[in-house]
Amino acid sequence: MNVSKINSLVELYFKKKSKVEKKKPFLKWLKPNNNIEYTWEEVTEKIYKLTNQIKIMINEGDRVLLLSENRPEWFIADIAIMNAGGITVPIFTTYAENDYKYILKDCSPSLIIVSNDNQFKKIEKFIENKKIISFETIQNESIPLSVILKKEGKKSVNDKLNRSMPACIIYTSGTSGYPKGVVLSHGGILSNCEGAEELLQPLIKKKKPVFLTWLPLSHSYEHTVQFIQILIGAKIFYAESLEKLILNMNDAKPTIMTAVPRFYQNLFTKISINFQKQVGIKKKLIDQTIKLGKKLLKKKKLSFKEKVINFFCQKLVRKKIQKQFGGNLQAFVSGGGALDQNIGEFLNAIGLPTLQGYGLTEASPVVSCNLPSVVKVDTVGPPFRTNSVKIAEDGEILVRGENVMLGYWNQKEATDNVIKKGWLHTGDIGEIDKNGFLKITDRKKDIIVNHGGD
């Protein structure tokens, strides 16, 4: 599919849907006692019906607040909102009360979509006289999704959308004060999808793509990832919880998984503690696995003896580790903050390929990422072909391209402070090495996200 000729995220979904087998499994929530797996056909039917209901409740260009945990209905609602002519405003389920109050006032949504009573109660006092749709029945005069799905109606696709129009407003915490609403366009996210598809092509060719989603879909990184999943025709599993993530990986057997640096830090800590408990031949084999794995990562040649040792490391250590993560993992992709170089080297060395990338919400969000064929863990990889990166005289990383945000919602001055002559000033200091790989060396100011991707 030529993404550069796609006009909107809605068009991306429906064009892909027309090319895949309609009975092909698509979305599954790994919630206890939940065995429902939606096919592409079933998801599409739900999108049509929810679109019809939303159209009745909003005008073109209205904001629709989406507050829910990760689940198939989140995906369905996002596509339906845009198909109905609305702008999705996804928000975290973990915000403080003041943040909910501020965001609701700032974006002034015409419609609110919530998953259940737990989420509704977080915003209840701030949404007087607002129209509400709920995924589950709640203690309010909302329209439950189950009622909407019983209705028949048109099966229409919005062909009025174009790449320059707002697709979503994603609120980012920054470093101080209230969250800023980052307005991302259809074209900005599509541009990111195009860059990601080129990056992932070698992995897609090896195995049918399967993703396990656990990072909140309200996060710009995971929000864009769901459209990459559409583009490459992936099967998507929604994790039960962070605590059950490893168990869920055994169920989903993902081929690709995206996460922020905090996840990899925690993973590194847990595996390191386990390694430290080992003694004797096991400990020696583990040490050799790390040592030789790092050597291979840096494209250094192994001696004959080292090749023999590495053969056993692969069979007895790396294969066992890979099996704990479902056995099909081809790559972890780290984004939304800087990944420690030692952690990146360690994970790659023990058989968990980890590609470090760089981005920020204001860039839709990915700017660069390491390649599956060339991993340089001291860098964040080469910039996506779909955006331009240059280093300013003071060392600041500047980004230009369709992926750059339309601006901050209701904040022209703040927008003008970070976008100058078409270049997004990231607030990060960096350099580009002789191979064209971007390296982050310092931070000029706190525009970029932290290790948790916030």
Language-model regions: role of each:
Residues 44-52, 182-203, 319:
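Conserved structural elements of the adenylate-forming
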Residues 26-58, 62-71, 75, 79, ...:
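Conserved AMP-binding/adenylate-forming core of the ANL superfamily
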Residues 23-25, 152-171, 178, 204-210:
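Conserved pre-ATP/AMP-binding loop-to-beta segment of ANL
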